[in-house]
């Protein structure tokens, strides 16, 4: 009976879970660009996510328009990714280590931007784009509606960009760097550009989350890469057979983030210890990463020897 009583509270918490999933879905699309398109493991996102939130809140507190604040957060993320790209390509530092170095630096930079560990922003005093307060309202300014619009616009822009000559060159760089160089493509430039664009999206997501929750925190991006990977992997596992188009693949990533947060909300509603959430997230990512390997090793149909002999004949 206690479980049923807990589950009765779940519908009231679903709008908030969906809103958070949509916000983190934008971050997950950024992770998708590096993880799947560039084939680069970028850990900068744990820092650039917080940078986006810090820049956005401080711009709003200084009296800037909400759109200007979001743009400044986006530019801060672009710069963060650019630094990681330069460390990796120009200085020859491995991508993972370059991301860690930038992430570590951004912690201090975020503290310097805000002046302290966190900064609050009141929806009653500032004109915010989204807020947790409106999540259950049936109106245009509902965060779910606003983030769906923002996500649709971003996916449309990315779909167009990756269909251009430059976008195709970036995709070719991630798919086959050696062949790309043989075709005269500047792979280093494309890697830097891809990392910058990815972290720009991550910072934009952080800016939106800071508005939604009403504050920016120096540690708000901690574990962001795990959430991003979880969204990517869940989206691919559930929708890969349905969504083949590049734009729809990005939609699946966003849906993966929503599903992730709904599952997290369900687990919390059932009384799971909130202190173990990071452990749960890491376990989910590990299992979904292992599924393709398990399928290939333990569940693939063995090739009959007769067929092999026929091919070799």
Residues of each region from the PLM?
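Alpha-helical transmembrane segments within multi-pass membrane transporters and channels
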Residues: 64-104, 109, 152, 255-256, ...
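Transmembrane alpha-helical segments in multi-pass inner-membrane proteins
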Residues: 202, 206-278
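Helix-loop-helix "hairpin" substructures at the membrane interface of multi-pass membrane proteins
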Residues: 80, 140-225
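Transmembrane helix-bundle core of multi-pass membrane transporters
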Residues: 95, 99, 103-163, 193, ...
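Cytosolic-side transmembrane-helix boundaries in multi-pass membrane proteins
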Residues: 175-182, 186-189, 248-251, 263-313
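Short, non-helical or kinked segments that cap or interrupt transmembrane helices
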Residues: 34-52, 87-101, 166-169, 193, ...
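Membrane-interfacial amphipathic/re-entrant helices at transmembrane-helix boundaries
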Residues: 1-27, 55, 63-68, 140-141
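Membrane-embedded helix boundary and interhelical linker motif in transport proteins
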Residues: 35-90, 136-140, 242, 269
């Amino acid at each position: 009976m206690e479980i049923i009583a807990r589950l009765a509270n779940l519908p009231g918490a679903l709008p908030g879970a969906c809103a958070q999933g949509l916000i983190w879905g934008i971050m997950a699309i950024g992770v998708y660009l590096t993880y799947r398109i560039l084939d680069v493991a970028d850990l900068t996102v744990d820092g650039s996510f917080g940078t986006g939130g810090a820049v956005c809140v401080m711009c709003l507190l200084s009296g800037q328009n909400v759109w200007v604040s979001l743009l400044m957060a986006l530019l801060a993320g672009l710069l963060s990714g650019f630094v990681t790209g330069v460390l990796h390509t120009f200085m020859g530092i491995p991508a993972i280590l370059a991301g860690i170095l930038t992430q570590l630096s951004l912690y201090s930079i975020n503290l310097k931007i805000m002046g302290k560990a966190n900064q609050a922003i009141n929806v009653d005093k500032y004109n915010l784009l989204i807020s947790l307060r409106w999540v259950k309202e049936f109106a245009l300014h509902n965060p779910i509606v606003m983030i769906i619009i923002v996500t649709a616009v971003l996916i449309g822009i990315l779909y167009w960009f990756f269909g251009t000559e430059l976008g195709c060159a970036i995709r070719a760089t991630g798919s086959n760097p050696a062949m790309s160089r043989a075709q005269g493509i500047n792979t280093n430039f494309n890697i830097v550009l891809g990392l910058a664009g990815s972290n720009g999206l991550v910072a934009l997501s952080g800016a939106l989350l800071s508005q939604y929750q009403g504050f920016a925190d120096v540690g708000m991006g901690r574990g962001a890469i795990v959430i991003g990977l979880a969204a990517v992997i869940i989206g691919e596992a559930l929708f890969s057979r349905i969504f083949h188009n590049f734009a729809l693949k990005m939609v699946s990533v966003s849906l993966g983030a929503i599903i992730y947060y709904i599952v997290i909300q369900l687990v919390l509603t059932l009384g799971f210890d909130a202190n173990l959430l990071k452990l749960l997230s890491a376990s989910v990512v590990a299992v979904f990463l292992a599924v393709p390997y398990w399928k290939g090793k333990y569940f693939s149909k063995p090739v009959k020897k007769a067929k092999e002999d026929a091919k070799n004949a």
